[in-house]
Amino acid sequence: MKRLLSLAIIASLAISYATPAVAIQESKVEVKHIKTEKVKPTTNKYEYVNLAFWRGFNDEHLNAYIVKALENNKDLKMASLTIEEFYQNVAAQRASQLPTINAGFLPGYSDIGAGAFDSYAVPLIASWELDIYGKNSNKTNSVRKLWESSILDERAAYISIASAVGSTYLNIVKLDAMIDLQEDIVKLRKEIFEMMEISNAEGLVSTSDLVKANQAYVAGVTDLTDMKKNRSKLLHQLAVLTGDSPNNIEEYARADYRTLAFSGNIPETVASEVIMQRPDYLKAEKMLEKAGIDVKVARKECLPSINLGGLVLFNAQHIGSLFNSNTALWGLGGGLLHPIFAGGKIKANLKSKKIAYEKSLRNYEKVNLTSMQEVNDSLVSVNMDKEKLAKQKEIQTLEQKDFELTKLKYQEGVIAKLDLNQKEENMLSVNQMVYASEFDCMVDYISYYKAVGAKTL
């Protein structure tokens, strides 16, 4: 009876680990198995963001915000936890390549007509699927590719957060400049309106011109309010990016907009190979490699599975004699099963994996094109905005000369104070335009930094 019991358990082990297999006609999808470099997590997260680039802005406040974001940003913490989660998935899948051993304790009580008695059993069951086709190791490699992809996602997140912090900070300093100049413009427009109000009372200025001056003053105040509102919103955004409370924005120091400048070098052209260091490009490669491995696994599901099983069973009426040699039995067995009919499941699974591979291939091609587009777009923005800034600085120089001449005329009594104020307002508007373009250029540098994966600059 015990022998029959042990054989039944071993047979059930063999059946439970058997894999259905049927003949499958190959589809027309050509699967190319690529091999990429292994990716491992780094303990120095600062390597992701290339701090040398940020030091090119020569701004200690910006550098401090970048470091603060790397240490406290919640998205980055979640990205790091995702890596650990996927690593545990790899460990769990790798365990399927090893034998499993289970133990149990089965107390019982029975009466078969000869008197009641107790019974105790302790089974030890071992099973192992022989990975002679490499199917389980392929499954482990497939899960490992997801883990490596999560590492690349973390790198992409670090670059993205650093870029967001830099762009947000520069736009805040840009608004500092706009607000400073706008306050001077509003002050001048108020003076112009007050002077025109006096002139209108004396009949020297028409009511229509007075209304226009008042409209310009009110519009200037409205623009100033919008600028302050946008700056507060950006400060809130910077606080969240750095893992801080938006209630602390009054403590956020910035550089003087008159001195902030980028001393780094951005090339006018770049080789197309630069996209190969972007984390999204590398991830697309990993996912394509994973899809190829999944097709391998699906093909190997067609093959029979070979399993080994073992049983040691201790069975006695008294618990004290449970582990005696005469109460034990053991057995070894194996199984090889190749079912004839599986309802088309294996064939459908293989086709599904090939479709997934083709989707990964198309995504890889798309990422390739999108990466080149983003690099080219960033270079066009850098070069064109530099050219625009150069022209605007020429206009600024001419406007400054014109204003100096106007001041001389006013000092000589040739023109009125109203004319001088209007000319000064024009100069301030041009200064706003130039500062805006300067900061737009610096934001373009950050876009290029992000487009090339924060590596080659």
Predicted regions and their residues:
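Metallo-beta-lactamase
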Residues: 227, 279-280, 360, 437
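Short, solvent-exposed, mixed-charge loop/turn linkers that connect secondary-structure elements
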Residues: 206, 225-275, 416, 443-457
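Amphipathic alpha-helical coiled-coil segments
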Residues: 78-93, 157, 161-184, 188-198, ...
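Small/polar (Gly/Ser/Thr/Ala-rich) solvent-exposed segments
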Residues: 77, 97-119, 127-156, 160, ...
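Gram-negative bacterial Sec-dependent N-terminal signal peptides
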Residues: 1-18
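Bacterial Sec-pathway N-terminal export signals of envelope proteins
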Residues: 19-89, 259-289, 339-340, 368, ...
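Membrane-embedded beta-strand positions in outer-membrane beta-barrel channels/transporters
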Residues: 66, 123-125, 169, 271, ...
